[in-house]
């Protein structure tokens, strides 16, 4: 997707807006962690004899605290083999390489960014892997970005007609249509399909969702407040629909063949994240927390 022109300049109360965004991402983190721990408690099928998982939170600092930091939340449980829910608020200067790629950074390399990232790798092959992130970025310009996408592990579930895919797309469509002044569902859906694609495999990573970036709407459409409200609702919709999908599937029995297929599909996930994912590259090249960034990788993987 071609990068749009983002008008220069920041609102007078940009510091208040930064604080509101940071506070929301941390509130959403707590909501998601509580929801996923609740699913750990609810399990009654395979692996229910194991203890339910709980998140372990690890604060980290960038540049010894001079560049901000974040909190890495990781859980290894009986529903989720590995799940990370991470928040960060960082600031600093872009490298010369990045200045040419980031809107507003060529005029002034200083930046501020806050966001949340979620990646869940379930134990049960019938439960799809999911990813969600939302963020606010400030240079000499300001914008929001983010999205959510679903990756079924079993080929027989990798269909747009599968009930999980239908539910996920319905939730993402609903949130976009609720904020139609700033969110274009078809555009964001197509952007997701275009972004989460493995060219070397000539296949999509999953069944899609939505993806958006460089969102800065004009005042007549609601401006910052409308963009922020949409970004908040993306997070809320994600929590709602993923809980529903997990509950529908997590008590289903699986076979060794299902597990084998899951591990091979996870390999595709690793390939995408290390070769193509902009967030991974951005984090590693701006002094982010390496463990947090690479926690998106699944704990066990196979390549045939």
Swiss-Prot record:
* Gene Ontology cellular-component annotations: cytoplasm
Q: Which Pfam families match?
A: Coprogen_oxidas (PF01218)
Residues that bind substrate: 117, 133-135, 287-289
Recorded hits in HAMAP family, A to Z, give: Coprogen_oxidas
Query: Which family does the similarity line name?
Result: Belongs to the aerobic coproporphyrinogen-III oxidase family.
How does the record describe its quaternary structure? Homodimer.
- Protein name in the entry: Oxygen-dependent coproporphyrinogen-III oxidase
Q: Which organism is it from?
A: Chelativorans sp. (strain BNC1)
Supply the gene name. hemF
